[in-house]
């Protein structure tokens, strides 16, 4: 069913995984949704930098909802395992080496969620989630100084259940993970000129702590890749830059300053090399829309709560997605 959505002028809120404000005049937009995949409820990552976990889990959830299998996964479980892994590593380093290590962080990439699921399994949301006021930034600082890793994680996030119960069936976290996300089920792609096309390479962005590899595709394939996946009923996990002046969660959409320009793969590469396109944020792409001028937009499920005109969703213009995509992850890319 086609839905018409309206956008009105409000102060700009520019947000990456952490949020800050800057005033900017925004054009009025009216969107018509042409294709919309089902999703789980919009969540809120709070002040953490866990967008990469929320977006990847949202993509997995939508895949199952489309198949008629309702599932709501625990971002806190994945986050806990990531923090645990970092903290344990620090415990077994000599102090002089540990001092040179990066601080414990919640930053990462969407593919790292899949790595952590493969290693530690999964829990569903009802069985394991933190209190709404839990501050991951404070927890990271405490873990940097503490040797009582499990005790601190239990106290801050919650005690881990040893098993998973779903629809009367008992699973281990590993068994549950395999029931919702098989190893190698998802493909990760990117597009840059400093590596050969159609080969995989570890993407050189600061948050790629696991040195995950991405298949390098031509830039001209970015948009068709997303469109084809959505039309076949598969969501796409989007990873990209949200630093542009016309990216506004408060208004519910993102555009480039020059939407009419014919952007090229060389423009993408230049922006990446000059740090104008950086790995800021992750969202789940779940639909296709157009505005009152007939311009195509992609509908994304965000993880910043529901306090915007579209109840937590955002519209990203096609030029924005072309220029500002760092990586895509999906089952049908």
Predicted regions and their residues:
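Active-site signature of cysteine proteases
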Residues: 35, 154-333
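C-terminal motif of bacterial Sec signal peptides marking the signal peptidase cleavage site
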Residues: 15-16
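N-terminal regions that are enriched for targeting/export leaders
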Residues: 22-37
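Structural recognition of the beta-strand scaffold that forms the well-ordered cores
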Residues: 50-53, 77-80, 113-115, 124-127, ...
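Active-site nucleophilic cysteine motif
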Residues: 46-60, 103-115, 281
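A short glycine/serine-rich beta->alpha loop
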Residues: 37-48
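Papain-like cysteine protease catalytic cores
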Residues: 72-171
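Sec-dependent signal peptide recognition
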Residues: 2-10
């Amino acid at each position: 069913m086609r839905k018409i959505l309206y956008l009105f002028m409000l102060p700009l809120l520019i947000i990456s995984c952490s949020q800050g404000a800057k005033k900017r005049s925004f054009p009025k937009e009216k969107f018509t949704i042409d294709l919309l995949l089902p999703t789980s409820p919009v969540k809120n990552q709070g002040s953490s930098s866990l967008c990469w976990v929320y977006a990847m889990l949202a993509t997995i959830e939508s895949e199952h909802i489309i198949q008629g299998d309702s599932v709501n996964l625990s971002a806190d479980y994945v986050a806990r395992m990531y923090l645990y892994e970092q903290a344990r590593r620090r415990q077994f380093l000599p102090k002089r080496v540990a001092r040179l290590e990066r601080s414990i962080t919640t930053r990462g990439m969407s593919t790292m969620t899949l790595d952590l699921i493969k290693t530690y399994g999964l829990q569903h949301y009802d069985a394991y989630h933190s209190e709404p006021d839990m501050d991951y930034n404070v927890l990271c600082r405490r873990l940097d100084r503490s040797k009582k890793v499990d005790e601190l994680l239990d106290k801050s996030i919650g005690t881990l259940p040893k098993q998973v119960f779903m629809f009367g069936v008992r699973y281990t976290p590993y068994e549950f993970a395999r029931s919702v996300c098989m190893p190698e089920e998802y493909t990760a792609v990117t597009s840059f000129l400093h590596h050969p096309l159609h080969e995989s390479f570890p993407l050189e962005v600061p948050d790629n702590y696991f040195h995950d590899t991405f298949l390098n595709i031509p830039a001209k394939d970015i948009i068709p890749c997303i469109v084809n996946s959505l039309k076949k009923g598969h969501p796409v996990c989007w990873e990209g830059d949200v630093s542009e002046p016309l990216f506004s969660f408060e208004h519910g959409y993102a555009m480039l300053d020059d939407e009419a320009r014919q952007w090229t793969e060389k423009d993408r590469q230049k922006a990446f090399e000059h740090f104008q396109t950086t790995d800021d944020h992750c969202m789940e792409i779940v639909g296709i829309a157009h505005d009152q001028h007939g311009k195509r937009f992609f509908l994304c499920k965000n993880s910043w709560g529901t306090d915007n005109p579209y109840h937590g969703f955002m519209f990203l213009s096609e030029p924005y997605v072309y220029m500002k995509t760092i990586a895509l992850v999906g089952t049908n890319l």
